[in-house]
Amino acid sequence: MTEQTYSLIFMRKNFVLACAALLLCAPGFAQTQKANYALAERFSAKRVNQMVFSTQITPNWFRDSDKFWYSWRTPQGTRYYIVDPVKGTRTEVFDMDRLAMQVTEFVRYPFEAKHLPIRDLRLKDDKEFTFSIISGLKNDRDTTCFRYEIATARLDTVAREKDKYPRWASVAPNGEFGVFAKGSNLWVMDSTSLRKAAKDEKDSTIVEHRLTTDGIRQFGYGYGNYSGDTEADSTKRHYPGELVWSPDSKRFATMKWDTRKLDDLWVINSVSDKRPKLESYKYQMPGEPGPKGYLYIFTMNDGRTGASARQVKSQAFKDQEVSLQSARRTAKDNYLDYWKNEWLGDNTGFYMVRQSRDLKRLDLCRVDVDSDSTKTIISERERTYVEYRTPFLIGGGKQILHWSERNGWANIYLYNSDGTLVRNLTEGAFHVEDILGVNEKEGYILLSACGVNKDENPYQMHTFRVPLTGGALQQLDMNDMDVLSTASDDAKFFVANYSRVDWTPAVALFSATGKRIADLETADLSLLFEAGYKFPERFKVKAADGVTDLYGAMYKPYDFDSTKVYPICDYVYPGPQVEANNISWSRGFTRTDRLAQIGMIVITVGNRGGHPNRSKWYHNYGYGNLRDYGLEDQKYAIQQLGARHPFIDLDRVGIHGHSGGGFMSTAAILKYPDFFKAAVSCAGNHDNSIYNRWWSEQHHGVLEKIDKGDTTFVYSIQTNPEIASNLKGHLMLVHGDIDNNVHPANTIRVVNALIRANKRFDMLILPGQRHGFGDMNEYFFWRMADYYAEWLIGDSERWKPDITQMNND
């Protein structure tokens, strides 16, 4: 062999080695990556609940003052506090060590302060607490009830109190009697019989009187008219009456619904009993005939044993929606022995909202109970759909605080009760979410709103004060946080729960002037951080139009190495009622933080059409294009992040979602088959022509056609089965087999289309599970983790029969 031949062989060998080295360094082909099952196992839902305790406060306001009490749990146990906003003090309710010793003496079973299982804690008369303790071994447990005097710290045992009124009774505001439904008709009991029924519904001394006789199955009164119970069951069981009361307890209003033309839908529970069980329920799909509602006002007789009924003409639109408006509950209402449900109004009349089936027309009406007349007070008209909030009455009912998106943003308007517009209370390019409270004496309202601070994430909610005379908004809480506030009845104080997706949750107490009275709590995440937890990172990108800002969060593996390259998975929900993107911190991160630990970058990001808390243009962007509207934005967001971060491998892109996100993730891998390589789609409404009418028609639109006086509704929409033949990547479809929200037929139709297109795919049916997957969520997680580990990471335990991580949990 000549020297020249040796040189040629050597050159070729070096060339091959150089090419191999380049390939090994190339993104997506690169270094061998191992899926980190152990790190994902460390943050199971069960284990996170052992590391994360209280993150928010629910203030329980006193009945006759601005004080409130709350509980707060940490790794050191649960503590209970009373806060006096006027004095600016916070006092522990119990000396927990002393209380544990006292309880131990009473029940003869040992307890210590950190593990004292206080249940059913209730404040009575602003002076004492009652609670119960379960003691003993598993097979020999007792419940002991206690009364604790706040002023003296005295502890006594008391008889166990049951609910004084059954929950199925709609009790009159005066508490003297209650109305309920049975056998599609309305009945009444006095308070004596109601209390007996709360203890034992079979008590033979209970007296009930029938109020109606015209109700029949599927055309009757109360909740039982819509339930899936058999006819025999519905004549025996008690159901809520679904009614609203006049403040003087003399009248109530209710709707009688005719649902006979609504078709049935079914699921079969294959694991319920010895025989599979058929569940039937009424389910209206888009374009199908709707129920007819009839408004009735009942006047109780003096003996409260009967009532006269009058039908009120309220029809304005075919297949209209009708909602009887309820007065807002106060802190004092929480101390009643029953759930108070007064109508919004006074003894002479009440308010109702009626809306056309296409939701483009809405009327706020007042019903006069003496003349049975219905008067339109405020009308809203849109070319997409109208949304609303319950009105707020002030000035003894003479004025109305009305929420509207008529100018493209959600603002508050002040009306007189005759429908005359007085003024705009807020007017700007921001979103008012709700009225938190009103102080008429001092002339202001407290409200929650977002998008006011233009240098912040527009989803971050804040608390504002605005004069009833109109004027600029005054922000009362902290900047650059997402704030969830609860106000006292007089709106003089509010409790602010605040956090960000990258900030530890905390709680502060404010006055209505903006004074920060006290920092109450900060969540203890120490155990979580000790386990290796790290906050996600916030980011901002552009939508596919290059103009609209989109906001998201990036979740990295906790052992992230910036020198490595990772696949990326997009956790999606298209909206339009909410986006998958977390704004505040939450412990529910199985599909984001935890999924990333397998060895991926996981992101959540909004898309045009995804959320109502921005402009109405943004919210309604997907109207008429419900399948595809958010897909381009999601793809473009990922591409921007890939260009921004060298550790993201755009050749290994996954997508995942549940419900609407299941629908969206499948649509994405079918619309962009060369971009998305793997999708796990759960409980998806893949064919919105068979999803529920309300959601599908509202967010996509329905055509109202009037021909020779006859009104019909036509619905047409693009579906995932129509594009199943586009599949190139790896798709796993998951559904609970008794999902009565998004029927399994949605997934089966995609399966049918894939089979007929000769496509390989994966499918997981979860037996006996409804829309949320119930006790099979952990099993589902590992099947999802296996799928992405195999197709995006290249290292999976998918083919092992045992999920050992679940056995260790």
Which residues does each predicted region cover?
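Bacterial Sec-dependent N-terminal signal peptides
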Residues: M1-A35
